[in-house]
């Protein structure tokens, strides 16, 4: 059994509302198919894969259904964390109900909790910048509020790990 981590999948979202990563350059051409080929060549069914964020451009769970079905179809048990572009993110209980209702049995939410995977503990929180110069934002952002909230979530996740 192996443990892998991959972030920033940026899958396209719901049919008819897709956002192509090719707008960021030709290197993103056919990215989902290339991801699938590489994943299937490397990841075994009993492996664990952490996907710590920026999973899909979808704006809500229903729009993300196709992308989650794709991820669920890939080998391995997946642990999904929240990234700064995961606007679809809901409460953990809503996401767990959604995953169960759609038969996404290999997907697990990593949020204020921890998992044991072989000889490793998987835990964490969304990363954030400590200063305004490092992150461009739209509108007023309370940096202290964001950093304090994510620090509390990280502490809860670490406490769940011990």
Task: Give the location of each predicted region.
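Core catalytic region of metal-dependent phosphoesterases/phosphodiesterases
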Residues: 2, 15-117
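Short, hydrophobic/glycine-enriched beta-strand segments
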Residues: 2-9
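Conserved catalytic scaffold of divalent metal-dependent phosphoesterases
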Residues: 9-14, 90-162
């Amino acid at each position: 059994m192996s443990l892998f981590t991959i972030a920033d999948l940026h899958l396209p979202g719901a049919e008819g509302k897709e956002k192509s990563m090719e707008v960021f350059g030709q290197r993103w051409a056919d990215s989902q198919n290339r991801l699938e080929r590489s994943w299937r060549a490397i990841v075994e069914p009993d492996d664990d894969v952490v996907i710590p964020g920026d999973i899909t451009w979808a704006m809500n769970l229903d729009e993300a259904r196709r992308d989650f079905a794709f991820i669920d179809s890939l080998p391995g048990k997946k642990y999904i964390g929240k990234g700064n572009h995961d606007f679809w993110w809901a409460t953990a209980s809503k996401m767990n109900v959604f995953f169960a209702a759609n038969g996404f049995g290999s997907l697990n939410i990593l949020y204020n909790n921890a998992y044991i995977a072989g000889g490793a503990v998987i835990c964490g929180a969304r990363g954030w910048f400590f200063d305004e110069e490092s992150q461009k934002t739209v509108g007023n952002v309370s940096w202290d509020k964001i950093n304090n909230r994510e620090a509390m979530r990280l502490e809860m996740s670490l406490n769940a790990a011990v």
